[in-house]
Swiss-Prot record:
Protein name per its UniProtKB record: G-type lectin S-receptor-like serine/threonine-protein kinase At5g24080
Phosphotyrosine, modified sites: 603
Native organism: Arabidopsis thaliana
Annotated catalysed reactions: L-seryl-[protein] + ATP = O-phospho-L-seryl-[protein] + ADP + H(+); L-threonyl-[protein] + ATP = O-phospho-L-threonyl-[protein] + ADP + H(+)
Phylogenetic lineage: Eukaryota, Viridiplantae, Streptophyta, Embryophyta, Tracheophyta
Membership in a protein family: Belongs to the protein kinase superfamily. Ser/Thr protein kinase family.
Disulfide bridge positions per record: 310-321, 316-332, 400-424, 404-410
InterPro entries named among the record's database cross-references: Bulb-type_lectin_dom, Bulb-type_lectin_dom_sf, Kinase-like_dom_sf, Prot_kinase_dom, Protein_kinase_ATP_BS, S_locus_glycoprot_dom, Ser/Thr_kinase_AS, SRK-like_kinase
Residues with glycosylation annotation: 49, 117, 208, 219, 261, 294, 353, 367, 390, 449, 459
Membrane-side (Extracellular) residue stretches: 26-472
GO molecular function: ATP binding; calmodulin binding; carbohydrate binding; protein serine kinase activity; protein serine/threonine kinase activity; ubiquitin protein ligase binding
GO CC annotation terms, alphabetical: plasma membrane
Length: 872
C-alpha cells in the first residue's frame, strides 16, 4: 500500500480521518530549482485540494520508476493518468528538476530521458492543478501565463475538460502482441473527418488500421476538439467558442445536477472522478470512481467504444480472434504455420510466420517448398501496405489460393464476395489479426514438408518424453476410466439438482450486463414468465410478456408469432448482431431462445412502458408529460434511430417507428424497441428485404407506390411520430370533428401562421418553449416530404433538433397532405369515418415483399470505420 494516499478508517460509532504524514508538497507554485527524486518516492508535488500529484511511481514488477501524474487521494496502487517516459522507466537515481532556465528535465544518471523543451521561454514557476494538468507558468510581462502543460502531451488517458485537438492523440501502452500500439486521434479519410481508433505497427510507422470511428464531423465549422465533460459525456465540440457539439457518448445521468442540488441544500458532495482510458487491448473505456456505502471503492466502467473485442485489430496479434463462451472475451487461435508462444505473458498469442517469405526469396524451387492450407470462414484486417494485389475477376475459390502459392511475397490470400462479386486479396503480412467471417475463406502459405496443426518446436527429446508419458498413462486406463465415469455421474447429478441456482447466477452475471445475448431454454422462459401469464402487449412481430430472472431482475419476453423462413443458425446470427448494438436509446437484447419451433427474445424491462401511454392519455394529467420531457424524448429517439442507420456495424431499417415501439425507463429516457427484427441490410445495399411490416399512419408513401424502401422510410415515420409528440394526439383521430381530425394539416397551418403554440398538446395549456416547438414542427414536416431525397437523414435530424445546424427553412407542405386538403377534409372525414366504423381492427399493413432479393456478403458486415482496402 503506497504511502502517497490518505485513509479514512472508522471505529465503532466514531469516524475520523487518519492521514499518513508524508512530505507531499501542496505548495500552490513550484519555484525554479525545485527537484523530485526517485529515491524519495514519498515526495511529490500535489494540487491545492490534494486531488492530483506528480512524482515518481514504481514501474511494477521491476524496481524502476515512471514520472507520473496520478489521483493522490485514492487507495491502492496509483492510478496513473500521465507519464512521459512509459517506454523508458528510470532507476532510483533519476531526478525531476525545474531548472533555472525554465526547462523541466527528467534525467537518470546524468542522461536526459525527457524534457519539456522550455529553456529561456519565460518560465517562472510550475503548478499541479486540480484538473490534473501540470503547468509551467510565466508572467504577463514575459510569455503569458501558461507556457507548457501536460495536457498538450497526453499519454493514454483523457481527464474531464482535457482537450484532444486535431494535432493531439492518445497512445496506449504497448499491446500484448508486442508488435504495435493503439491510438485515438482525428482521422482525415478522403472527404470525411472523424474521431477514430487505430492499431499501429511499431516497426512500420505507416502501417496502421482504423477499426472504430465516432460520428462523422466533416461538415462542422471551426476548430474541432474532443473532450470529456464534467457530466461524463464524451463529445466533439466545434465552432466559435465551441458552441456546437456532437456526442460520441452521452451520459444519461447528470452528476452535476445532483451536485448542485446538494449544494443548494447546504450539503457537500464530492465531484465525480472520471477518466477515459485507451487500454492496451485497443478499447477506449470510460471509468468512474465509485465509493460504495460499505466502504469498498473501485473504478467502475461506464462505457466502452467497442463491445465485441474481435472488432479490434491486433488484439490477437497475427492470430485469429474468436469470442469465448461468455461472448465477452477474445479467444485467440493460431493459423497453420504458427504456434502459441511459450511464455505465459503471451499465452494467447501466436508466433510469426514471416520467415516463410524470406525463405521463399532465397529458394529457387519456390512452389515445391510450400503448400497452401485452407482456413474456412476466416478473414483478416489489412491495410494498403499489406496488399500485393487485388484480383476481382477470380474464377473460383481454389484459384485464390493458387495465386498466393505462385507469388513469392504472398503470406496469405483472402477470398470473399463484394456485392456478390468475387474478390481475392493477395497479402504480404497478417500483422493486424484475423476474425471469424462466414463469407470469407483464408489461404495460408505453409511449408510443404510439415503437417498442421503442429508444434514447430517439437524435437526428438520432447517426442521421446511425451511418448514415455503416454505409455505410463496407459498402464492404468481402467482405473482412470472408472474415476472419470464416477466424476461425470456426480457432475450430472449436481447439474440436475442445481440447475435453477445456476440459472440465477448466470442471469445475474451475464443477463443484467447484456454485453451479449444469453441462450435460454424454452422451459427457462416458461418458468420466468409464469407460463406466459402476464401480458404486456402485442406488436407487429409478436406478443410480449413480463418475466423475472434470478428472482429480482425484470425482463420483457417477446414470443415471435410467425415462423421464420431461415434456420436456427441464421436466427442466432441475427440475434447476436442485434445484441451487439449498444446505445443508450436502444432497448438492450439480453437473451433469446431457439428451440424446436420456438423463437423468443428477452429484452430489458422498461418500467414506464411505451410512449403512447404518456402522450395519448385522456384529459387526466396523471400521465401528462411536460414539454421539456417531450422534446428530450424526441431528440433522444432520433439519436437512437440515427445510430442503427449510420453508426452501427450493420445498417438497419426499422420499418415500424411509432410511439408503441418507443419505450421509457424509470428516468423517461426513451429506447427504441423492435429494431433489427426486419431483415438487416448490408451497407452497400439500398433496399430492404422481405418479411417487413409497418403500421398505417406512419408508413412512407413509397410503401404504397411500390418504390424502393430505404432508411428514409424510417425518417418519414419519425416525422409522423414527432408530430404526435408535439400534439399529444394521433395524427388521424376520428374522435375529432372534420376540421381537426387530421393533425398534420392543422399543425402546418398553425406553423405558417406563426401560431405554433396552438398546435401543442392542449393539456399543456401553452406551457412550452415556442422556439423548440417551431423547430420540432419544421423538422417533422421536412421528414414527411413525399420526395425521398428531400427528407433529411436521421443524423441531420439530430443536428437540427439539437440546434447544431443553421436556421431551419420552412418546409413545403407535403404533396399528400396538400392533395388531402384540396380534396376536401369534410368528404375525406366522412369516408374515413365509414372505414373506421367498419374496420376498427385493420391497423397493420401485411407483409410486403420488395422486388429486390438479398444475399449476405462479407461486405455487409462492414464497420463504419472499415479500411478502404479491406473487404470488412
Amino acid at each position: 500500500m503506497s504511502s502517497f494516499h490518505f485513509y479514512f478508517p472508522s471505529v465503532g460509532l466514531f469516524s475520523f480521518f487518519c492521514f499518513f504524514l508524508v512530505s507531499l508538497a501542496t505548495e500552490p507554485h513550484i519555484g525554479l530549482g525545485s527537484k523530485l527524486k526517485a529515491s524519495e518516492p514519498n515526495r511529490a508535488w500535489v494540487s491545492a485540494n490534494g486531488t492530483f500529484a506528480i512524482g515518481f511511481t514504481r514501474f511494477k514488477p521491476t524496481d524502476r520508476f515512471l514520472l507520473s501524474i496520478w489521483f493522490a487521494q485514492l487507495p491502492g496502487d496509483p492510478t496513473i493518468v500521465w507519464s512521459p517516459n512509459r517506454n523508458s522507466p528510470v532507476t532510483k537515481e533519476a531526478v525531476l528538476e525545474l531548472e533555472a532556465t525554465g526547462n523541466l528535465v527528467l534525467s537518470d544518471q546524468n542522461t536526459v530521458v525527457w524534457t519539456s523543451n522550455t529553456s529561456n521561454h519565460g518560465v517562472e514557476s510550475a503548478v499541479m492543478s486540480e484538473s490534473g494538468n501540470f503547468l509551467l507558468l510565466g508572467t504577463e510581462v514575459t510569455a503569458g501565463p501558461t507556457i507548457w502543460q501536460s495536457f498538450s502531451q497526453p499519454s493514454d488517458t483523457l481527464l474531464p475538460n482535457q482537450p484532444l485537438t486535431v494535432s493531439l492523440e492518445l497512445t496506449s501502452n504497448p499491446s500484448p502482441s508486442r508488435h504495435g500500439h493503439y491510438s485515438l486521434k482525428m482521422l482525415q479519410q478522403h472527404t470525411s473527418l472523424s474521431l477514430g481508433l487505430t492499431y499501429n505497427i511499431n516497426l512500420d510507422p505507416h502501417a496502421n488500421y482504423s477499426y472504430w470511428s465516432g460520428p462523422d464531423i466533416s461538415n462542422v465549422t471551426g476548430d474541432v476538439t474532443a473532450v470529456l465533460d464534467d457530466t461524463g459525456s464524451f463529445k466533439i465540440v466545434y465552432g466559435e467558442s465551441s458552441i456546437g457539439a456532437v456526442y460520441v457518448y452521452k451520459n444519461p445521468v447528470d452528476d452535476n445536477r445532483n451536485y448542485n442540488n446538494s449544494s443548494n441544500l447546504g450539503l457537500t458532495k464530492n465531484p465525480v472522478l472520471r477518466r477515459l482510458v485507451l487500454e492496451n487491448n485497443g478499447n477506449l473505456r470510460l471509468y468512474r470512481w465509485d465509493n460504495d456505502m460499505n466502504g469498498s471503492s473501485q473504478w467502475v466502467p461506464e462505457w466502452a467504444a467497442v463491445s465485441n473485442p474481435c472488432d479490434i485489430a491486433g488484439i490477437c496479434g497475427n492470430g485469429v480472434c474468436n469470442l469465448d463462451r461468455t461472448k465477452k472475451n477474445a479467444d485467440c487461435l493460431c493459423l497453420p504455420g504458427s504456434v502459441k508462444l511459450p511464455d505465459q505473458e503471451n499465452a494467447k498469442l501466436c508466433s510469426d510466420n514471416s520467415s516463410l517469405v524470406q525463405e521463399c526469396e532465397s529458394n529457387i524451387n519456390r512452389n515445391g517448398s510450400f503448400k497452401i492450407s485452407t482456413v474456412q470462414e476466416t478473414n483478416y484486417y489489412f491495410s494498403e501496405r499489406s496488399v500485393i494485389e487485388n484480383i476481382s475477376d477470380i474464377s473460383n475459390v481454389r484459384k485464390c489460393g493458387e495465386m498466393c502459392l505462385s507469388d513469392c511475397k504472398c503470406v496469405a490470400s483472402v477470398y470473399g464476395l463484394d456485392d456478390e462479386k468475387p474478390y481475392c486479396w493477395i497479402l504480404k503480412s497478417l500483422n493486424f489479426g484475423g476474425f471469424r467471417d462466414p463469407g470469407s475463406t483464408l489461404f495460408v502459405k505453409t511449408r510443404a514438408n510439415e503437417s498442421y496443426p503442429s508444434n514447430s518446436n517439437n524435437n526428438d527429446s520432447k517426442s521421446r518424453k511425451s511418448h514415455g508419458l503416454r505409455q505410463k498413462v496407459l498402464v492404468i486406463p481402467i482405473v482412470v476410466g472408472m474415476l472419470v465415469l464416477v466424476a461425470l455421474l456426480g457432475m450430472l447429478l449436481y447439474y440436475n439438482l442445481d440447475r435453477k441456482r445456476t440459472l440465477k447466477r448466470a442471469a445475474k452475471n451475464s443477463l443484467i450486463l447484456c454485453d451479449s445475448p444469453v441462450s435460454f431454454t424454452y422451459r427457462d422462459l416458461q418458468n420466468c414468465t409464469n407460463n406466459f401469464s402476464q401480458l404486456l402487449g402485442s406488436g407487429g412481430f409478436g406478443t410480449v410478456y413480463k418475466g423475472t430472472v434470478a428472482g429480482e431482475t425484470l425482463v420483457a419476453v417477446k414470443r415471435l408469432d410467425r415462423a421464420l423462413s431461415h434456420g436456427e443458425r441464421e436466427f442466432i446470427t441475427e440475434v447476436n448482431t442485434i445484441g451487439s448494438m449498444h446505445h443508450m436509446n436502444l432497448v438492450r437484447l439480453c437473451g433469446y431462445c431457439s428451440e424446436d419451433s420456438h423463437r423468443l427474445l428477452v429484452y430489458e424491462y422498461m418500467i414506464n412502458g411505451s410512449l403512447d401511454k404518456w402522450i395519448f392519455s385522456s384529459e387526466q394529467t396523471a400521465n401528462l408529460l411536460d414539454w421539456r420531457t417531450r422534446f428530450e424524448i424526441a431528440v433522444a429517439t432520433a439519436q437512437g434511430i440515427a445510430y442503427f442507420h449510420e453508426q452501427c456495424r450493420n445498417r438497419i431499417i426499422h420499418c415500424d417507428i411509432k410511439p408503441e415501439n418507443i419505450l421509457l425507463d424509470d428516468n423517461f429516457c426513451p429506447k427504441v424497441s423492435d429494431f433489427g427484427l426486419a431483415k438487416m441490410m448490408g451497407r452497400e445495399h439500398s433496399h430492404v428485404v422481405t418479411m417487413i411490416r409497418g403500421t398505417r399512419g406512419y408508413l412512407a408513401p413509397e410503401w404504397v407506390s411500390n418504390r424502393p424502401i430505404t432508411v428514409k422510410a424510417d425518417v418519414y415515420s419519425y416525422g409522423m411520430l414527432l408530430l404526435e409528440i408535439v400534439g399529444g394526439r394521433r395524427n388521424l383521430d376520428m374522435s375529432y370533428d372534420a376540421e381537426d381530425f387530421f393533425y398534420p394539416g392543422w399543425a402546418y397551418k398553425e406553423l405558417t401562421n406563426g401560431t405554433s403554440l396552438k398546435a401543442v398538446d392542449k393539456r399543456l395549456q401553452g406551457v412550452a418553449e415556442e422556439e423548440e416547438v417551431v423547430k420540432a414542427l419544421k423538422v417533422a414536416f421536412w421528414c414527411i416530404q413525399d420526395e425521398v431525397s428531400m427528407r433529411p437523414s436521421m443524423g441531420e435530424v439530430v443536428k437540427l433538433l439539437e440546434g447544431t445546424s443553421d436556421e431551419i427553412n420552412l418546409p413545403p407542405m407535403p404533396q399528400t397532405i396538400l392533395e388531402l386538403i384540396e380534396e376536401g377534409l369534410e368528404d375525406v372525414y366522412r369516408a374515413m369515418r365509414r372505414e373506421f366504423n367498419n374496420q376498427l381492427s385493420s391497423l397493420t399493413v401485411n407483409t410486403i415483399t420488395t422486388s429486390q432479393s438479398y444475399r449476405s456478403s462479407s461486405r455487409s458486415h462492414a464497420t463504419c470505420s472499415y479500411s478502404s482496402m479491406s473487404p470488412r
